[in-house]
Curated annotation (Swiss-Prot):
Pfam families per the UniProt record, alphabetical: DUF222 (PF02720)
Superkingdom of the source species: Bacteria
Signal peptide, first to last residue: none
Region Disordered: start-end pairs: 422-454
Annotated family: Belongs to the Rv1128c/1148c/1588c/1702c/1945/3466 family.
The protein's name in its UniProt record: Uncharacterized protein Rv1792c/MT1741/Mb1728c
InterPro entries noted in UniProt: DUF222, HNH_nuc
Organism: Mycobacterium bovis (strain ATCC BAA-935 / AF2122/97)
CDD domains, sorted: HNHc
Amino acid sequence: MYSSSREEAVAAFDNLDTALNRVLKVSPDDLTIPECLAMLQRCEKIRRRLPAAEHPFINKLADQTDQTELGGKLPFALAERLHISRGEASRRIHEAADLGPRRTLTGQPLPPLLTATAAAQRAGHLGPAHVQVIRCFLHQLPHHVDLPTREKAEAELATLGGRFRPDQLHKLATKLADCLNPDGNYNDTDRARRRSIILGNQGPDGMSAISGYLTPEARATVDAVLAKLAAPGMANPADDTPCLAGTPSQAAIEADTRSAGQRHHDGLLAALRALLCSGELGQHNGLPAAIIVSTSLTELQSRAGHALTGGGTLLPMSDVIRLASHANHYLRIFDHGRELALYHTKRLASPGQRIVLYAKDRGCSFPNCDVPGYLTEVHHVTDFAQCQETDINELTQGCGPHHQLATTGGWITRKRKDGTTEWLPPAHLDHGQPRTNSYFHPEKLLHDSDEDDP
């Protein structure tokens, strides 16, 4: 089924490039309308088949490589090499695991987990949206549905997918799920598999969408908290002194014009703020669990622009000023990008140094990594064994996987003259990729810089 020769594999893709180049030169001028539709149908069939060609390569990388060889976890490595999003890379990895070829521990070939869906994809009958519907259907089936029934249902949906649009297939899958589980029986394993809370990206107005599924216990907990803090008159930001405990006054209740959704938002914010202020969360990466905000004195004085939190959230200056009114402040002093008077002779970074790194790096400094500061570790650019001091100018932030690459993965870190950290890959991973991370510093992309000057 698959070419085992390196030369055959390269030749096959060369032939594919050649054939596609010929297709790109085809003009529709001499074709009738039915013929144009037929050509588009053939294009769609080819597009649907291409993922089946990717699955064996992805599965090999997943099974036979490690982070050191890839330069990071597989989703990150694919996203960087293919210039796709991390989410898309993860989707392809999971799809390949379900639809791609497998092998036993002794190397014997096995059919794909979703045999019928894989065959329909290889034939060009199913597109990515069809496959997503089928995979979600199987993922959401309750635990008590046996394997033969699952396989029969999967085969039925794979056949229907070749005749219906994805939105129509979704409706058919919903009806089939009701037939297989008419009583709606789900156990703790089924519910635990679906639990999730997803925070969307910030929009132009700074707002973030939230979605997901709460377990019954989580729902009961949220209900109890909101019953108190989301009641009319409670935690109302429009009040001069919002009521956060006890019973709000009748005047506060009558003056509350918020919708139920707005009260839920404000009640949840009040609960989370109280948890942070309680100190019960302890420390996170060497600092008390808290909102860490970095901004400039100019922006504070002008009351314009945005500040950045350690989690990568942009805060309007009005929010920053309100938070700062009851916070401890830390002055960051620097000279042309280099920090002053922040070093000591201990190996571990001090709390002050960690705070400065939040403002300086804003997140993992590995090229194109988007892990925010809250989720990073402190890395010595020059190994502590060599310098015997922890100087802020020789520290940088790195997420766990990338910090490990610098420790045991053969990557070299160094500081440029402007204080930016460079990550130099080992030879087998060097394909001309960036050496520095501009993700958290988009302003650097707006002016020329000397990338090669260490």
